[in-house]
């Protein structure tokens, strides 16, 4: 029972109480760049979740055989291999989304969340716990991406996942789209607003004053 509770805590903690974006301020670049559409945000979420979970699992499995002097190189090799798998899969089965995500799929290799969990958790814990930690951090990252992507697409173009929700005036509807929300700077303010909201509701996440 205790072990089950530990696994549950590892899985759920990164989603709210220890979210990699709202608390640790990691993975911000892709959160700004790929959230102009909900579809892109969902695909990036799945990609990061897959890479984080399986890189944690594989690194944890061989952690006792990795020389300390080359551990970062080994971690990056495993992460890069998984990113290549994701990139080739998207090119084969979702080419249009792959083109929209552009270099940001490849840049998962350098995502602070992926590297951070490999070094801080997978190198010190067993494979199953490490896998669940990767899933949890991928979900925590994805929750923010999906919130930002949904907000930007809905109020920026009046649609969600390509389906019209707010009919645009240009098409005879009533909603005047806000083009600013489709630009990357808007994501910066939305993410900032989410961080503010989370820390207002959870004062324990506010950094102490110096």
UniProtKB/Swiss-Prot annotation:
Reactions it catalyzes: a ubiquinone + n Na(+)(in) + NADH + H(+) = a ubiquinol + n Na(+)(out) + NAD(+)
Subcellular location: Cell inner membrane
Entry's transmembrane regions: 42-62, 66-86, 103-123, 131-151, 154-174, 178-198
GN (gene name): nqrD
Gene Ontology process terms (BP): sodium ion transport
Entry EC no(s): 7.2.1.1
Membrane topology: Multi-pass membrane protein
Job description of the protein: NQR complex catalyzes the reduction of ubiquinone-1 to ubiquinol by two successive reactions, coupled with the transport of Na(+) ions from the cytoplasm to the periplasm. NqrA to NqrE are probably involved in the second step, the conversion of ubisemiquinone to ubiquinol.
Annotated protein name in UniProt: Na(+)-translocating NADH-quinone reductase subunit D
PANTHER family with a match to the protein in the record: ELECTRON TRANSPORT COMPLEX PROTEIN RNFE, NA(+)-TRANSLOCATING NADH-QUINONE REDUCTASE SUBUNIT D
GO cellular component, one term: plasma membrane
